[in-house]
Swiss-Prot record:
Catalyzes the reversible formation of acyl-phosphate (acyl-PO(4)) from acyl-[acyl-carrier-protein] (acyl-ACP). This enzyme utilizes acyl-ACP as fatty acyl donor, but not acyl-CoA. Keywords: Cytoplasm, Lipid biosynthesis, Lipid metabolism, Phospholipid biosynthesis, Phospholipid metabolism, Transferase. It catalyses: a fatty acyl-[ACP] + phosphate = an acyl phosphate + holo-[ACP]. Its EC number is 2.3.1.274. It comes from Chlamydia trachomatis serovar A (strain ATCC VR-571B / DSM 19440 / HAR-13). Signal peptide: none annotated. The keyword Transferase applies. This is Phosphate acyltransferase. NCBIfam families: PRK13846.1 (NF010420). GO terms for cellular component: cytoplasm. Pathway: Lipid metabolism; phospholipid metabolism. GO terms for biological process: fatty acid biosynthetic process; phospholipid biosynthetic process.
């Protein structure tokens, strides 16, 4: 199956050429595998820089009139109808792409994607879903930044999407998965009124699969497979975890064994999936360097090839009680 992947070259904290280099590495690594067709979206000045690159013969380049910056408000982003982000999402909506990757403005990407890409039926609100390494493999966390404030019904929707995602990637259709609610303590009485209500709803719906409240340290232990949280808390958790890993890597350097680096390196996982959409949109961290971009783009290819959004939609319906 040929995968058609769109990549937004613009809007991240890095130079667009860093994205270009990551694309080249992905193409080299995929030689001999099923073909991948890349379409990149960039402004005319960046397009001009890319024309002399040998890679330009293997990648389709679409020229955008503008790009969405990290400083742009949502209104400013929406008004940029011909931005690299908007053109990429338009191509995805029209069926010209199987997935789209951007490391640009998160709020703008979520808003534009939601306005252009249909939601999966019965999904109350999209969420950013990310995989993190654990002692037993990996866990998924959602939401990590799509929505700052959510209600208990929407948190339950996140739980169902996380479960549907794990089920869609499992080779064993009967494999059990466990869920936990990220909170300030493991006791049922901990947290805000919203957390307490969410706790009760998750327990009633998922039964023994819901292991209750979990603290941040429990995430990496592998205690649960799906971590449910609001976008504010999830984003703070994720950025803290990424910062801690980078800190340890700098401090320990070569003393940190390669196997350990690989086990806990978040950059080998895809970026955040905007779960709840009917088509695949991946958000890479704005500060993503070459390795993280390589992981995000490679992961997007794998997810597109697995037709993960359609499988989530099928599973989500099964998980609605």
């Amino acid at each position: 199956m040929k995968v058609r992947l769109g990549v937004d070259m613009m809007g991240g904290d890095h130079d667009p050429l860093v994205v270009w280099e990551a694309l080249g590495e992905v193409l080299l690594s995929s030689i001999g595998e099923q073909p991948v067709e890349f379409t990149v979206f960039a402004t005319s000045d960046v397009h001009h820089q890319l024309m002399n690159s040998p890679l330009s013969r293997s990648v389709r380049i679409v020229t955008a009139e503008d790009f969405v910056s990290m400083e742009d408000s949502l209104l400013a982003a929406v008004r940029k109808k011909r931005s690299s982000m908007a053109l990429g999402l338009d191509a995805l909506q029209q069926g010209d792409l199987d997935g789209f990757v951007s490391s640009g403005n998160t709020a703008a990407l979520v808003t534009l994607a939601r306005s252009k890409i249909p939601m999966i039926p019965a999904v109350p609100r999209p969420a950013l879903l990310v995989s993190v390494p654990t002692l037993s493999g990996f866990a998924v966390i959602l939401d990590v930044g799509a929505t700052v404030s959510v209600n208990p019904d929407e948190m339950v929707g996140f739980a169902r999407m996380g479960l549907a995602y794990r089920q869609s990637l499992s080779s064993n259709s009967n494999q059990p998965f466990t869920l936990g609610l990220l909170n300030i303590g493991s006791e049922e009485r901990k947290g805000t009124d919203s957390h307490k209500q969410t706790f009760r709803m998750l327990r009633n719906i998922f039964g023994s699969a819901f292991l209750g409240n979990i603290e941040s340290g429990d995430v990496f232990s592998g205690k649960v497979d799906i971590v449910v949280t609001d976008g504010f808390t999830g984003n703070v958790f994720l950025k803290t975890a990424e910062g801690l890993f980078d800190f340890l890597r700098r401090i320990l350097g070569d003393r940190l064994e390669k196997s350990i680096k690989m086990q806990f390196d978040y950059t080998i996982y895809p970026g955040s999936i905007i779960s709840g959409l009917s088509r695949l949109v991946i958000k890479c961290h704005g500060k993503s360097h070459g390795t993280a971009l390589f992981g995000g783009i490679s992961g997007a290819i794998d997810l597109a090839r697995a037709n993960v959004c359609s499988r989530i939609a099928d599973r989500f319906g099964d998980n609605v009680v």
